Amino acid sequence: MESKETVRIGGRRSKLAVVQSEQVKVMIESKFSHIECPLLSVHTLGDQVQSKPLYSFGGKAVWTKELEDLLYKDDESRIDLIVHSLKDMPTLLPDGFELGGITKRVDPTDALVMPIGSPYSSLSELPDGSVVGTSSVRRSAQLKRKFPNLKFESIRGNIQTRLAKLDDPETPYKCIVLASAGLMRSGLDSRITQRFNADTMCYAVGQGALGIEIRKDDEKMKKILKEICDPSTTICCLAERSLLRTLEGGCSVPIGVVSNYDESTKVLTLKGIVINVEGTEWVEIEHKVTISNEREDSINCGKELAAKLTQNGAKEILDSINLDKIT
């Protein structure tokens, strides 16, 4: 029997990350019968340090560095690709690495989750001073804009840990906010009380999609990934990431997006919001382009929207954000 070719997949060790790695494994193995994909799960700094809010880390390498080191190992721990939640991938990767592909996006929205048995079904029903748990300043800033009567506090941990904290009878949280996609991929759709629409909350860049990181110029991996990645999602997410990169915002900065690509008209619509941490100042603009060259036009769309936002005060908002980061 002919031995199979091996493509080693790396990912974080959380339950959700393992599910995501397994999804990519299935995609590749179902397209290529001669390939098998063993999985390697790794604890990253972001997994290990649970006592600090995410914004204090200052950047996204907190989720990626340990895995990136394995792409260039010369022993049995070497991997060929890394599966990330795209929203956690830095928009500027270190030398020697590149974004090899983006999978089809599932629901990109943010979700409100109430404790089991809660009498409430929306933020507008909560009593003044109720505590909302979220690890994201993007979420808390946008919600403060709409619900200044509520309090927002950090909550860390994987999805199961956060849900356990929420459901604890002694919990300080009246509700928490999570990515809809993470709940769906974890089989926890039933915990979603409400999905926020774009009027209330723009989602994170890349949210709901998986980004696959590879060694730079690894043509073999590029050919494999081309077969499992989604063109429409790629167009939207390249534009979103270009916007974020041009504005120089990391995952710790309140920048939200909403994007849509119409395959029939080839029109890409990208909306961006830059908002201060307090939710009192913001700039929100929508931009449309017709796509002819998928990569080039998508990236330019993000750059053009970034320029519009900057012209309307986004830079001043971002410059005013002074967060206490880990040095």
From Swiss-Prot:
Pathway: Porphyrin-containing compound metabolism; protoporphyrin-IX biosynthesis; coproporphyrinogen-III from 5-aminolevulinate: step 2/4. This is Porphobilinogen deaminase. Coiled coil: none annotated. GO terms for cellular component: cytoplasm. Its cofactor is dipyrromethane. PROSITE patterns: PORPHOBILINOGEN_DEAM. The porphobilinogen subunits are added to the dipyrromethan group. The modification S-(dipyrrolylmethanemethyl)cysteine is found at C251. Keywords: Heme biosynthesis, Porphyrin biosynthesis, Transferase. Tetrapolymerization of the monopyrrole PBG into the hydroxymethylbilane pre-uroporphyrinogen in several discrete steps. Its EC number is 2.5.1.61. It comes from the Eukaryota. CDD domains: PBP2_HuPBGD_like. Gene3D superfamilies: Periplasmic binding protein-like II, Porphobilinogen deaminase, C-terminal domain. Binds 1 dipyrromethane group covalently. InterPro entries: HemC, Porphobilin_deaminase_cofac_BS, Porphobilin_deaminase_N, Porphobilinogen_deaminase_C, Porphobilinogen_deaminase_C_sf. The keyword Transferase applies. The keyword Calcium does not apply. Pfam families: Porphobil_deam, Porphobil_deamC. It catalyses: 4 porphobilinogen + H2O = hydroxymethylbilane + 4 NH4(+). Belongs to the HMBS family.
